Every structure is written in structure tokens, then in C-alpha cells.
């Protein structure tokens, strides 16, 4: 949409004031850093530093002592990898895991977790769950949600 057509979200969405503070933020990081980059991917050190800065920004932005941040990774399937071999959704996962582990070690009072959603077909099984350009459709998204829900529930103590 052209800027004049942005009636629902005028201005920079990063500057929208939020009235309340969430108890949970779930992120999916690393996919664009480690796929489709022609081999020009970040080092573990630079990715870990950027991930830490981003995670810090969440705690600064929301200033909720009860805030839980969960960095998820994966969510792929064999069909997605076959459709686009340079879009391996699990490729960034060791980097995201290591960055999260380093963050937790440096910030033990903050509730930050890592969750891997496998890419082996055990979650998104390639049966009617892939839509446009190899992305998950509504069924694929529901499969990921069904996998994550009990794990998030456990982390949150719900």
C-alpha cells in the first residue's frame, strides 16, 4: 500500500505505543540471516550479539518483570526444503540455540527460552499443509501451533 492508504497503521509500526505490557513474546529468528544469502551469513559472534541486543530491546520496551521471551526456530518440512533448497528453516537453529543459551547465561534472572520445531516432517508433514511459494498454509500453521502450544503452556506455567 502507498503511505496515504495506511489508514489502519499510520506511521512507523515500530513507534506504535502499546498501552499494556505482554507477559510473553515469541520470536522466530535467523531464517533471513542464514538462508538466501549466497554464503554471506553472520558469524556466531555477530549473530549472538545481534540476538542479545534484540532480546534486551524487548525487555527495555516492555519493562515487565514477568516477561517471558521464547525464541523459536525450525518449523520447516521436507517439502519446503525440496521446493527451495536454499530455504532450510532448520539451518539457523544451531545459531539461534547458541545465541539463546549465551543470553540466558549472561542474564540468568531473565526468562528467555529456546524451542526447536523439527523440520523432519514430524510437525509439518507435507500432506496438504504447504501453500504459496512453499510456505505453510493454514493447516501447516495449525500444525506448528499444535506443537508449540503445550510447550509454551509448560514454560508459562498455565
Residues covered by each model-derived region:
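Conserved SGNH/GDSL esterase-like catalytic core that processes O-acyl groups on lipids
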Residues: 1-52, 80-94, 121, 131
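Structural recognition of the beta-strand scaffold that forms the well-ordered cores
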Residues: 23-28, 33, 68-73, 113-117
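Extracytoplasmic, non-cytosolic globular domains
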Residues: 42-74, 78-79, 88-101, 148
